[in-house]
Amino acid sequence: MKKRGKGVGSMWYGIGNTGLPNPAAAFVEIHGDGSANVMFGAADIGQGSGTAMAQIAAEELGLDYEKIHVTWGDTMVTPDGGATSASRQTLITGNAVILACRQAKETLAKTAAEKLDCAPEELSFRDNTVFITADPERSMTYGELMAAMKAAGRMAVGAGSYNPNTTGLAPENMSGIPFEVYSYATTIAEVEVDTETGEVDVLKVVSAHDVGTPINRSMVEGQIEGGVTMGQGFVLMEEIEVNTKNGAIKNPSMSKYIIPSNRDVPEIHSILVESEGGPGPFGAKGVGEPALIPMIPAVVAAIEDALGTRFTHTPIMPKDIVAAVKAQEK
C-alpha cells in the first residue's frame, strides 16, 4: 500500500561565525579601457561566489558585468577571504568588494569632478559613465575618465575589508550579538510511502527563503534546489554503516554510500522572499546552509503524516519504515 503525507520545516540561521571575528578583504583595480579586476580570497566551490562578486562590483562601479574580471582563491595575490562556510561569503566578502570599489571611486570622483566642474559628491556612476546626478548630460565615459586619470598621474585602486558587527556570547547567560544578520526559511514537502517495501518518494517541495536582495536570482534558486536535494539524501539515503568491533566505516565508497541522483530529485518550487535594508551588499543574505536545513524536518514530518508514526532519527531507511508499519499492526 502507498500512503501520502505532507510536512513543514522552518528554520532561522545566523550568517557567519558565532560571535567570532571572521573578516574578509578584497582588492579592486580599474584599467585604462574601463574594465576592472576584482581580487579576493574566497573560494568558489560551485555556489557561484565569483559571479556574485563580479555582479556586486559591476553594480557599485557602474560598469557592465562583462567588464569585470575576477581573480579568486590565489593565495599568492589575493587577500584572505576566510572560509567558504556558514553562508558568509555574500555578506562578508561582498561587503569587502563594495568597500574596495568605493575607495577606488574616491580617486575617480576627484578626477571627474575636476573635469566636469562639480563636487565629487554630486557624481553618479552608471552604464559605464560618470555623470552629474542633477544634470546627466554632463558626463564622461569610463574610458575618458581613465585617460584623465593617467594624465593626472593617478591610479584607480582600492582595498576593502569587512568584519561583521558581532559580540561574543557571555558565558553566564549566553547573551550577546553572535550574528549580524539572520536568514529564515520554510519548506513544505509531499511524500509517498510504500508500506510494503519501505521506499519513500519525495513528490513535490516548496521552499521559501528570506534572501534579502538577491544578487543573482537564478543562482539563489539553484542553491535552494541543491539544498533541497541534499536534505532529501540526508533523510532518506545517507546512512553511515560502522563496524562496531573496530570502528571502521563499512560503506566508504560512493557506490555504497548512496546520495540522490537526477532521477530522485522531486518537483521543486523555490520562493525568494525579498527585503531591503540589511547589512549585506545591497541587502543580500547568504543562502548556503539555509537551503538544506528546513528540508530535513519537512520530509521527516511528511513521512510521519503518511504513517502516523513518530521518527526520532535520520536517515529513515526502508527497513525503518517497514519496522514501523509492522509495529503498528501488532
Swiss-Prot record:
<dbReference type="InterPro" id="IPR046867">
    <property type="entry name" value="AldOxase/xan_DH_MoCoBD2"/>
</dbReference>
<comment type="subunit">
    <text>Heterooctamer of NDHM, NDHL, NDHS and NDHF. Dimer of heterotetramers.</text>
</comment>
<keyword id="KW-0500">Molybdenum</keyword>
<keyword id="KW-0521">NADP</keyword>
<dbReference type="GO" id="GO:1901848">
    <property type="term" value="P:nicotinate catabolic process"/>
</dbReference>
<comment type="function">
    <text>Catalyzes the hydroxylation of nicotinate to 6-hydroxynicotinate. Also active against 2-pyrazinecarboxylic acid, but inactive against other nicotinate analogs.</text>
</comment>
<feature type="active site" description="Proton acceptor">
    <location>
        <position position="289"/>
    </location>
</feature>
<dbReference type="GO" id="GO:0050138">
    <property type="term" value="F:nicotinate dehydrogenase activity"/>
</dbReference>
<keyword id="KW-0560">Oxidoreductase</keyword>
<keyword id="KW-0479">Metal-binding</keyword>
<dbReference type="GO" id="GO:0005506">
    <property type="term" value="F:iron ion binding"/>
</dbReference>
<feature type="binding site">
    <location>
        <begin position="85"/>
        <end position="90"/>
    </location>
    <ligand>
        <name>Se-Mo-molybdopterin cytosine dinucleotide</name>
    </ligand>
</feature>
<feature type="binding site">
    <location>
        <begin position="284"/>
        <end position="289"/>
    </location>
    <ligand>
        <name>Se-Mo-molybdopterin cytosine dinucleotide</name>
    </ligand>
</feature>
<feature type="binding site">
    <location>
        <begin position="45"/>
        <end position="49"/>
    </location>
    <ligand>
        <name>Se-Mo-molybdopterin cytosine dinucleotide</name>
    </ligand>
</feature>
<keyword id="KW-0711">Selenium</keyword>
<dbReference type="InterPro" id="IPR016208">
    <property type="entry name" value="Ald_Oxase/xanthine_DH-like"/>
</dbReference>
<feature type="binding site">
    <location>
        <begin position="211"/>
        <end position="223"/>
    </location>
    <ligand>
        <name>Se-Mo-molybdopterin cytosine dinucleotide</name>
    </ligand>
</feature>
<comment type="similarity">
    <text>Belongs to the xanthine dehydrogenase family.</text>
</comment>
<protein>
    <recommendedName>
        <fullName>Nicotinate dehydrogenase medium molybdopterin subunit</fullName>
        <ecNumber>1.17.1.5</ecNumber>
    </recommendedName>
</protein>
<comment type="pathway">
    <text>Cofactor degradation; nicotinate degradation; 6-hydroxynicotinate from nicotinate: step 1/1.</text>
</comment>
<dbReference type="InterPro" id="IPR037165">
    <property type="entry name" value="AldOxase/xan_DH_Mopterin-bd_sf"/>
</dbReference>
<dbReference type="Pfam" id="PF20256">
    <property type="entry name" value="MoCoBD_2"/>
</dbReference>
